[in-house]
From Swiss-Prot:
It comes from Xenopus laevis. It is found in: Mitochondrion inner membrane. One of its GO terms (biological process) is protein insertion into mitochondrial inner membrane. This is Mitochondrial import inner membrane translocase subunit Tim10-B. The twin CX3C motif contains 4 conserved Cys residues that form 2 disulfide bonds in the mitochondrial intermembrane space. However, during the transit of TIMM10 from cytoplasm into mitochondrion, the Cys residues probably coordinate zinc, thereby preventing folding and allowing its transfer across mitochondrial outer membrane. The lineage of its organism: Eukaryota, Metazoa, Chordata, Craniata, Vertebrata. Disulfide bonds join 29-54, 33-50. Heterohexamer; composed of 3 copies of TIMM9 and 3 copies of TIMM10/TIM10A, named soluble 70 kDa complex. The complex forms a 6-bladed alpha-propeller structure and associates with the TIMM22 component of the TIM22 complex. Interacts with multi-pass transmembrane proteins in transit. It is a peripheral membrane protein. It holds the Pfam family zf-Tim10_DDP.
């Protein structure tokens, strides 16, 4: 595959993943913090605080999971290299 096309595909996938994360986060936080039948157009103080905390926690967990998955992926790559070296040296 052409490196430019690969880079473009990776960028498109990243945008799609970020949009998916945003949609899931807003849906989950809205469901948790805003009652299904509301009478006011503006958020109440409690709803606003709840949404702020929910989004903050969601992003924090997303970042932690990303770091952990990257760490595990690197460990897997190192293990595969060691296994391949063991196979080629025998």
């Amino acid at each position: 595959m052409d490196p430019l096309k690969a880079q473009q595909l990776a960028a498109e996938l990243e945008v799609e993943m970020m949009a998916d994360m945003y949609n899931r986060m807003t849906g989950a936080c809205h469901k948790k913090c805003v009652p299904p039948h509301y009478k006011e157009a503006e958020l109440s103080k409690g709803e606003s605080v709840c949404l702020d905390r929910c989004v903050s926690k969601y992003l924090d967990i997303h970042e932690r999971m990303g770091k952990k998955l990257t760490e595990l992926s690197l460990q897997d790559e190192e293990l595969m290299k060691k296994m391949q070296q063991g196979v080629t040296s025998t």
